[in-house]
Amino acid sequence: MTITKAKIAAMLSSKLGFSNNLCEEIVHTVFSNILEIAKEQKLTLKNFGSFEVKQKNPRPGINFHTKAPVIIESKKHLRFVPSSKLKALINESTR
């Protein structure tokens, strides 16, 4: 299931009784702050999981079209590790 920030804001608005515009601003601010923190350091959301930016080292690869060896450049990737509580909730709901 894919959910948009607008849908999250609409759900908050209906649940809390705030205006949709205020809820959209809150959701945007929360996600922006999470992204800023996650860019710089490991971010752990209690009972949800951890986000961490990791650096991948350069490595050898092969160009599939020419079969020539190439070096795949280093790059950053985002790693998410779910908390044990989130894992338990997911496994509990599938039983």
Curated annotation (Swiss-Prot):
Record flagged with keyword Signal:
no
Top-level taxon: Bacteria
Q: Name one GO cellular component term.
A: cytosol
Coiled-coil portions: none
Molecular-function annotations in GO: DNA binding; structural constituent of chromatin
Query: Which InterPro entries has this protein been placed in?
Result: Hist_DNA-bd (IPR000119), IHF-like_DNA-bd_dom_sf (IPR010992)
Keywords of the record, alphabetical order, are: DNA-binding
- SMART domains found in the cross-reference section: BHL
Keyword DNA-binding on entry: yes
Q: What are the disulfide bonds? A: none
Family membership, please give it: Belongs to the bacterial histone-like protein family.
Query: What name goes with this protein?
Result: Histone-like DNA-binding protein
